[in-house]
Protein backbone atom coordinates (compact mmCIF):
# COMPACT_ATOMS: atom_id res chain seq x y z
CA UNK A 1 0.00 0.00 0.00
CA UNK A 2 1.34 3.45 -0.94
CA UNK A 3 2.22 5.81 1.90
CA UNK A 4 -0.57 8.29 1.03
CA UNK A 5 -3.13 5.50 0.78
CA UNK A 6 -2.12 4.17 4.18
CA UNK A 7 -2.37 7.68 5.64
CA UNK A 8 -5.86 8.21 4.20
CA UNK A 9 -6.97 4.83 5.52
CA UNK A 10 -5.71 5.71 9.00
CA UNK A 11 -7.45 9.09 9.05
CA UNK A 12 -10.75 7.53 8.00
CA UNK A 13 -10.36 4.88 10.71
CA UNK A 14 -9.86 7.57 13.37
CA UNK A 15 -12.90 9.54 12.19
CA UNK A 16 -15.12 6.46 12.03
CA UNK A 17 -13.94 5.22 15.43
CA UNK A 18 -14.76 8.58 16.99
CA UNK A 19 -18.29 8.49 15.56
CA UNK A 20 -19.02 4.85 16.36
CA UNK A 21 -17.81 4.99 19.97
CA UNK A 22 -18.63 8.61 20.75
CA UNK A 23 -15.04 9.30 21.81
CA UNK A 24 -12.17 11.61 20.92
CA UNK A 25 -9.45 10.10 18.75
CA UNK A 26 -6.10 11.66 17.88
CA UNK A 27 -3.74 11.48 14.95
CA UNK A 28 0.04 11.58 15.21
CA UNK A 29 1.79 14.91 14.70
CA UNK A 30 1.21 15.85 11.06
CA UNK A 31 3.21 18.01 8.70
CA UNK A 32 1.55 20.72 6.61
CA UNK A 33 0.90 18.43 3.67
CA UNK A 34 -0.80 15.84 5.87
CA UNK A 35 -2.87 18.54 7.57
CA UNK A 36 -4.09 19.72 4.17
CA UNK A 37 -5.07 16.16 3.26
CA UNK A 38 -7.08 15.83 6.48
CA UNK A 39 -8.77 19.16 5.81
CA UNK A 40 -9.80 17.97 2.34
CA UNK A 41 -11.60 14.98 3.93
CA UNK A 42 -13.81 17.01 6.26
CA UNK A 43 -16.80 16.94 3.92
CA UNK A 44 -16.78 13.13 4.07
CA UNK A 45 -17.46 13.21 7.82
CA UNK A 46 -20.05 15.98 8.45
CA UNK A 47 -20.92 14.43 11.82
CA UNK A 48 -17.32 14.72 13.06
CA UNK A 49 -15.47 17.83 14.23
CA UNK A 50 -11.78 17.95 13.35
CA UNK A 51 -9.60 20.27 15.41
CA UNK A 52 -5.83 20.73 15.49
CA UNK A 53 -3.17 21.68 18.02
CA UNK A 54 0.60 21.45 18.21
CA UNK A 55 0.82 22.31 21.89
CA UNK A 56 1.26 26.05 21.43
CA UNK A 57 -0.03 28.87 19.25
CA UNK A 58 1.03 28.84 15.58
CA UNK A 59 2.69 25.41 15.78
CA UNK A 60 3.65 23.99 12.40
CA UNK A 61 3.42 20.28 13.19
CA UNK A 62 -0.02 19.59 14.61
CA UNK A 63 -2.11 16.75 15.95
CA UNK A 64 -5.70 16.33 14.74
CA UNK A 65 -8.48 15.55 17.20
CA UNK A 66 -11.64 13.86 15.89
CA UNK A 67 -14.81 14.04 17.97
CA UNK A 68 -18.59 13.89 17.50
CA UNK A 69 -20.26 17.25 17.04
CA UNK A 70 -22.36 16.84 20.21
CA UNK A 71 -19.61 15.56 22.50
CA UNK A 72 -20.68 16.15 26.11
CA UNK A 73 -17.36 15.97 27.99
CA UNK A 74 -14.12 17.93 28.05
CA UNK A 75 -10.82 16.55 26.78
CA UNK A 76 -7.19 17.49 26.28
CA UNK A 77 -4.65 16.77 23.59
CA UNK A 78 -2.17 14.04 24.62
CA UNK A 79 0.76 16.42 24.18
CA UNK A 80 3.63 17.20 26.55
CA UNK A 81 6.37 19.80 26.26
CA UNK A 82 9.93 18.92 27.29
CA UNK A 83 12.86 21.27 27.83
CA UNK A 84 16.46 20.43 26.94
CA UNK A 85 19.41 22.37 28.34
CA UNK A 86 23.13 21.64 28.76
CA UNK A 87 24.34 20.17 32.05
CA UNK A 88 27.37 22.44 32.00
CA UNK A 89 26.79 25.66 30.08
CA UNK A 90 30.53 26.37 30.00
CA UNK A 91 31.27 23.23 27.97
CA UNK A 92 28.19 23.22 25.75
CA UNK A 93 28.19 23.49 21.96
CA UNK A 94 26.11 25.68 19.70
CA UNK A 95 23.26 23.33 18.86
CA UNK A 96 20.81 23.71 16.00
CA UNK A 97 17.29 22.43 15.34
CA UNK A 98 18.87 19.68 13.23
CA UNK A 99 21.09 18.62 16.14
CA UNK A 100 18.15 18.28 18.54
CA UNK A 101 15.98 16.46 16.01
CA UNK A 102 18.83 14.12 15.13
CA UNK A 103 19.40 13.25 18.79
CA UNK A 104 15.71 12.42 19.24
CA UNK A 105 15.43 10.32 16.09
CA UNK A 106 18.64 8.47 16.95
CA UNK A 107 16.73 7.00 19.89
CA UNK A 108 14.80 4.97 17.32
CA UNK A 109 11.50 6.88 17.46
CA UNK A 110 9.38 7.94 14.51
CA UNK A 111 9.15 11.60 13.51
CA UNK A 112 5.37 11.40 13.89
CA UNK A 113 5.57 11.24 17.71
CA UNK A 114 7.45 14.56 17.82
CA UNK A 115 5.95 17.98 17.18
CA UNK A 116 7.78 21.27 16.82
CA UNK A 117 11.23 21.89 18.26
CA UNK A 118 11.82 25.47 19.36
CA UNK A 119 15.44 26.54 19.89
CA UNK A 120 16.38 29.69 21.79
CA UNK A 121 19.92 30.46 22.89
CA UNK A 122 21.31 27.44 24.79
CA UNK A 123 18.01 25.62 25.33
CA UNK A 124 15.36 23.86 23.27
CA UNK A 125 11.73 22.95 23.85
CA UNK A 126 9.99 20.18 21.96
CA UNK A 127 6.50 18.73 21.92
CA UNK A 128 5.77 15.02 21.91
CA UNK A 129 2.96 12.54 22.36
CA UNK A 130 2.58 12.14 26.11
CA UNK A 131 2.94 8.36 25.85
CA UNK A 132 6.57 9.04 24.83
CA UNK A 133 7.41 11.45 27.65
CA UNK A 134 8.94 8.96 30.06
CA UNK A 135 10.94 7.37 27.26
CA UNK A 136 12.55 10.69 26.35
CA UNK A 137 13.15 11.62 30.00
CA UNK A 138 14.93 8.33 30.61
CA UNK A 139 16.88 7.96 27.36
CA UNK A 140 17.87 11.35 25.99
CA UNK A 141 21.12 12.31 27.70
CA UNK A 142 23.25 13.88 24.97
CA UNK A 143 22.88 16.11 21.92
CA UNK A 144 25.95 15.83 19.71
CA UNK A 145 28.82 15.99 22.26
CA UNK A 146 26.89 18.00 24.85
CA UNK A 147 25.53 16.25 27.95
CA UNK A 148 22.06 17.56 28.61
CA UNK A 149 19.31 17.80 31.20
CA UNK A 150 15.77 17.11 30.07
CA UNK A 151 12.67 18.05 32.07
CA UNK A 152 8.93 18.15 31.54
CA UNK A 153 7.46 21.64 31.30
CA UNK A 154 4.62 21.85 33.81
CA UNK A 155 3.76 25.54 33.42
CA UNK A 156 3.00 26.98 29.98
CA UNK A 157 4.62 30.25 31.09
CA UNK A 158 7.96 28.43 30.98
CA UNK A 159 7.65 28.09 27.22
CA UNK A 160 9.53 30.87 25.38
CA UNK A 161 7.56 33.42 23.44
CA UNK A 162 8.76 34.26 19.93
CA UNK A 163 10.76 37.45 19.56
CA UNK A 164 9.20 39.37 16.69
CA UNK A 165 10.42 42.41 14.80
CA UNK A 166 8.41 44.43 12.31
CA UNK A 167 10.21 44.98 9.00
CA UNK A 168 8.99 47.23 6.19
CA UNK A 169 10.43 48.15 2.83
CA UNK A 170 9.99 47.86 -0.91
CA UNK A 171 10.48 44.62 -2.82
CA UNK A 172 12.18 44.93 -6.19
CA UNK A 173 10.01 42.08 -7.47
CA UNK A 174 7.34 39.78 -6.08
CA UNK A 175 9.65 36.81 -5.60
CA UNK A 176 10.39 34.71 -2.54
CA UNK A 177 14.13 35.42 -2.57
CA UNK A 178 13.45 39.15 -2.89
CA UNK A 179 11.01 39.14 0.02
CA UNK A 180 13.32 37.18 2.33
CA UNK A 181 16.37 39.29 1.46
CA UNK A 182 14.36 42.38 2.44
CA UNK A 183 13.35 40.83 5.77
CA UNK A 184 16.90 39.77 6.66
CA UNK A 185 18.62 42.82 5.14
CA UNK A 186 20.90 40.84 2.86
CA UNK A 187 21.32 40.08 -0.84
CA UNK A 188 18.98 37.89 -2.86
CA UNK A 189 21.80 35.62 -3.96
CA UNK A 190 22.75 34.83 -0.36
CA UNK A 191 19.22 33.56 0.29
CA UNK A 192 19.09 31.05 -2.56
CA UNK A 193 20.64 28.15 -0.62
CA UNK A 194 18.08 28.62 2.17
CA UNK A 195 15.13 28.46 -0.23
CA UNK A 196 15.81 25.87 -2.91
CA UNK A 197 14.26 22.57 -1.95
CA UNK A 198 13.58 23.75 1.59
CA UNK A 199 10.49 25.94 1.21
CA UNK A 200 6.92 25.04 0.35
CA UNK A 201 3.80 26.78 -0.87
CA UNK A 202 0.66 24.75 -0.24
CA UNK A 203 3.03 21.77 0.27
CA UNK A 204 4.69 22.15 -3.15
CA UNK A 205 8.44 22.58 -3.16
CA UNK A 206 9.63 26.05 -4.07
CA UNK A 207 12.68 27.26 -5.95
CA UNK A 208 14.26 30.66 -5.41
CA UNK A 209 12.83 32.10 -8.63
CA UNK A 210 9.20 31.44 -7.68
CA UNK A 211 6.83 34.31 -8.29
CA UNK A 212 4.45 34.78 -5.38
CA UNK A 213 1.53 36.04 -7.46
State each model region's role.
Residues 184-185, 194:
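A short glycine-leucine-enriched loop at secondary-structure breakpoints
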Residues 166-171, 190-194, 200:
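Strongly charged, low-complexity linkers/loops
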Residues 180, 187-189, 199:
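Internal, well-folded beta-alpha domain core
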Residues 1-183:
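Ferredoxin-like alpha/beta domains used as RNA- or RNAP-binding modules
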Residues 135, 157, 193, 210-213:
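A broad, structure-centric signal for solvent-exposed, well-ordered loop/edge residues
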Residues 201-213:
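Single conserved hydrophobic/aromatic residue that forms the stacking wall/gate
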Residues 132, 187, 209:
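A generic "binding-loop/recognition-motif" signal
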Amino acid sequence: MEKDEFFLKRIRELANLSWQRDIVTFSDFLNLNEQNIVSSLKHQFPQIVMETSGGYENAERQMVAFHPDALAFTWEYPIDCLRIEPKALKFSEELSHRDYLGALLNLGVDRSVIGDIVVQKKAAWFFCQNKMTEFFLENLCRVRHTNILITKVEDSDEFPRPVLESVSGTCASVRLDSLISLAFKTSRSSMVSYIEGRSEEHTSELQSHLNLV
